[in-house]
């Protein structure tokens, strides 16, 4: 089965390298990623756990695979080899037990299945929740990763499986630590505000680290193309923002009142990413991978989402 192939794009002798790509967990992030890669001329396979999910993948024009990474037997049927693999899987709900099965056990199962037929690049999407800093400090990829939550510790252990595989067997893993994703139908603080149930913990000084879905997709593609195996990259936009600033902007933009202030311990939004307070730095993503953000801050991204909702008569 061929892996790399070239596609002629005209008489000028220009060629695009066509690769076989597998997207694991082809859902909120993985599906638009697959569509974008398909538009670039690649052969894209999307893995989902159910036949219903696979049907969504097929309707998007991708080649569906039904398998569950928590079941080693399911992975035996993967049509290996692939040039690129992007693991964008989500645990859904279920807390730490689900994280253990999907992220840690799933990663271990994938490494075992790919041992004899590794890809040229393997992208793992984790979370900035592995950073437990609570002092509003800046965090870069080399900052201490001491998660404050059980799920954060599981995510860190899953990363370590991949780093060990890189150091011991040169497995081409690139690790992405993704901030809170927002976009169509997603974005905890934005959606809470639009529903009228948002609350501001304390004085609203805790920082939010966010990234728009479109930029997650773009950054993953940049990592597939240029990411260095064994390296970690933070995926967050240019502006970590205090909650008070975020909600003031929404209030002014929409002409709605500010959310109420509540004690930190009673906040509805508390605990989404542990009791952390940090400013995630994306410098390495931009300088090393050359990524340019479509939505550099929450202002551009939330404005686009608000406009989308208005055009759909949902706001």
Regions found by a protein language model. Give the residues of each.
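Amphipathic terminal alpha-helices
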Residues: 297-315
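NAD(P)-cofactor binding segment of oxidoreductase domains
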Residues: 81-123
